Regions:
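Flexible, gly/pro- and Lys/Arg-enriched active-site loops
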Residues: 36, 43-54, 64-70, 74-174, ...
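Short, low-complexity intrinsically disordered segments enriched in A/P/G/S/L with frequent Arg
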Residues: 179-183
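N-terminal beta1-alpha1 ligand-phosphate binding loop
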Residues: 1-42
Length: 192
């Protein structure tokens, strides 16, 4: 099974709920095994003026090919209400395939590692938090090493908001991720 890392982003509607819904959908996918989630960060948008984003990264195990993985991510976006308006525009949900094991893929629209991963704090900070040793095969550096090369100004524009919690039961019927089930109240503050 290959470890793949998926960047999550949302800046329209209930952003936290969009991220949670994406994680739950990824956990339900027959071809994916959810292996971890980063904390959630609020970030400035890249591109035209628009609301701030919430971003996170998840690690999934998969036996699907890189192209099939990307196809499923796009289908999940559509299922969750993604409407493609303009490049780098506001979105209800965005799922980006950041890394797929140590593979390098350049096939049409599919580029792995994600071509801007090494320069974007909103992706590198949650990736390095989740998996500091995740390896970028083109840059020959880990996520933590790449993060250390970003300017301090870029890192300061990314603000920790909280944690994503899976609410789906594990196959054995226990709480997701082990331990106690999540508290019944929402621990995340509303972020505008």
């Amino acid at each position: 099974m290959i470890d793949a890392y998926v960047g999550l982003g949302a800046n329209l509607g209930d952003r936290m709920e969009s991220l949670r819904a994406a994680v739950e959908q990824l956990a339900r996918e027959p071809g994916f095994l959810l292996r971890g989630t980063s904390p959630v960060y609020e970030t400035e948008p890249v591109g035209p003026p628009q609301p701030r984003y919430l971003n996170a990264v998840v690690r999934i195990g998969t036996l699907l090919s890189p192209r099939a993985t990307l196809r499923r991510l796009l289908e999940i976006e559509e299922l969750l209400g993604r409407v493609r308006r303009e490049r780098w525009g506001a979105r209800e949900i965005d799922l980006d395939l950041l890394l797929y094991g140590d593979r390098i893929v350049a096939d049409g629209a599919l580029r792995i590692p994600h071509p801007h991963l090494h320069e974007r704090a909103f992706a590198l900070i949650p990736l390095a938090e989740l998996a500091p040793d995740a390896y970028h095969p083109q840059m020959a550096r880990t996520a933590a090493e790449l993060l250390s090369t970003l300017p301090e100004e870029a890192r300061q524009q990314v603000r920790l908001v909280g944690k994503l919690r899976r609410t789906l039961p594990e196959p054995d019927g226990g709480p997701a991720g082990g331990g106690s089930p999540p508290a019944p109240t929402d621990p995340f503050p509303k972020v505008c």
